[in-house]
Amino acid sequence: MLSNQSILVTGGTGSFGHTFIPMTLEKYNPRKMIIYSRDEMKQWEMAKKFEGDSRVRFFIGDVRDKERLNRALDDVDYVVHAAATKIVPTAEYNPFECVKTNINGAMNLIDACIDRGIKRVVALSTDKASSPINLYGATKLVSDKLFVAGNSYAGGHDTRFSVVRYGNVMGSRGSVIPFFMSIKEKGDGALPITDERMTRFMISLEQGVELVWHAFEDMEGGEIYVKKIPSMKVVDLARSVAPEAQLEFVGIRPGEKVHEQMIGEEDSFYTYEYPEHYKILPAIHNWSNSEERIKDGQKVANGFCYTSNNNPHWMSVQDLQNWIKANQQKIGEI
């Protein structure tokens, strides 16, 4: 589907883009890949990695700027929306800015994609959008609903929108694994943990890319795709990084949950299970009963929840140590 196509990635200099771009170039050989982002230094650094590859282009711009988006989307077939304000405390202390990027930016992109006749758009979401308690999660919930509704908003146009929902991305820049590793390397003492009960979903960047590929292949429009991924206990992660270190329990930060949720009870009425993922179908227009969207899925039980503490798949301390050892060179780099 993506072979010989033109693909634009918003926020393409982030962790996702650094993995999605080379993997997609290798697997699909697209005609053109455009990285759309607002940080010129990150673009300059990323461009060095793709020097000489005429398929890769860079476009300075902000999702808040609809006119610039419209220009960037010229001759584009597919869009991945990865741009976001995503650090929870940053969003809490800068709420207006978070709304401008995560909500207004989504609206701008939806409008521009429809106007430009883009074929398919996949937006990246987060487990924090399910029953959100922080501003970041709330803005991503609104964003998810905007992209789902975009299929109706498009009217007679052919543009289709879907969403993929992730857990914590293992080893990405600013995530907990490089944070713990930096404390260990500096010998700064105890590893801070907000709550000893805390659990999190974990997904690799490669799994995230594959879920986007699957969404492009499978989508009819309006679906939210949720990858089946393992959970881990944060205390186990700390022990896997620094087995001898003391753990300091510092209390939950504003906007944090003890356990994360990917699919809530209220979504269970419209959720179908597949071997490697779940699919939440939109309630609007009776699309949740659409055979072309359900395909070979099995309806989950009403009241089903997919949370990081009730997950049947877990990463042990040994599993985490093995992953860290195998990915030592790239942890925190992208």
Residue ranges of each PLM-predicted region?
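Conserved Rossmann-fold cofactor-binding substructure of NAD(P)-dependent oxidoreductases
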Residues: 57-78
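Rossmann-fold scaffold of SDR-type NAD(P)-dependent oxidoreductases
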Residues: 10, 73-82, 123
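Conserved Rossmann-fold NAD(P)-dependent oxidoreductase catalytic core, especially the SDR/UDP-sugar
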Residues: 81, 85-141, 145, 149
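N-terminal Rossmann NAD(P)H-binding glycine-rich loop of SDR-like oxidoreductase domains
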Residues: 6-26
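Strand-loop microenvironment adjacent to phosphate/nucleotide-handling motifs in alpha/beta enzyme folds
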Residues: 1-5, 115, 145, 149-334
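Conserved glycine-rich Rossmann-like NAD(P)H-binding loop of the short-chain dehydrogenase/reductase
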Residues: 29-42
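Conserved residues in the N-terminal Rossmann fold of short-chain dehydrogenase/reductase
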Residues: 37, 59-60, 100, 249
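Conserved S-adenosyl-L-methionine
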Residues: 23-32, 117
